Amino acid sequence: MYIFEILLKNPDSSIVLLENERKTKMYERWDKVLKNHPKYFGVLSRVKFVPGQSHQNFVNLMKCSDVLIDPYPFGGCNSSLESFSIFKPLVTQPSIRINGRFTYGFYKKMGMDEMIANNMEEYVDITTKLLKDKEFYDKQVNLLKER
C-alpha cells in the first residue's frame, strides 16, 4: 500500500520496479488490496515494471530517477549503498527483520534522520517532500556528499 499512497499523493509520478520471480505474487497481493481499497484502482497503471538489469544499467536507472524508496519491509543493502554513491536520497522505514534495517543503520551512522520514516504516513510524506521541495531534496543530496 506504500507505493499506492505515494502515487495517490503525487498524481504526476510513476513508480518503476524491477521484474523478478515475485511479480505474480505481488499482483495477487495487489488484487486483494484493490478489492478492499478501491481508491487505489486508478494508480496501478502508474506502476511500471522493467526487466532485471545489469549492474551498470541498474545504477543508470537509479541516476535518472527523481526519488528512490527502500522497499518496506524488505529494505536494501547494496542498492542503498549504490544510491548513496551517486548521491541519491533514499526513503526508508526500518522493519523488524535485519534486512529491513540496513538503510536505517547507514542513515543513523551518517546522522541523516530526516530520511527515516516511523510509519507509512511518514514514509509517504518524506517521499512527497523529496519530490516537491527542491530545497529539502538538495539538502539531502549535500548531506550525502559530505558523508
Language-model-detected regions and their locations in the chain:
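Short hydrophobic signal-anchor/transmembrane segments that target glycosyltransferases
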Residues: 1-12
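Short, structurally constrained coil/turn elements
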Residues: 9, 43, 109-111
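Loop/turn elements at helix/coil->beta-strand transitions in domains of secreted/extracellular proteins
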Residues: 11-13, 87-88
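Short beta-strand segments
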Residues: 14-20, 51, 92
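Glycosyltransferase donor-sugar binding loop
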Residues: 15-31
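Nucleotide-activated donor-binding/catalytic signature segment of Leloir-type glycosyltransferases, i.e.
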Residues: 28-52
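Short acidic active-site motifs
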Residues: 56-58, 79
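Catalytic binding pocket for nucleotide-activated donors in carbohydrate/polymer assembly enzymes
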Residues: 63, 67, 71-147
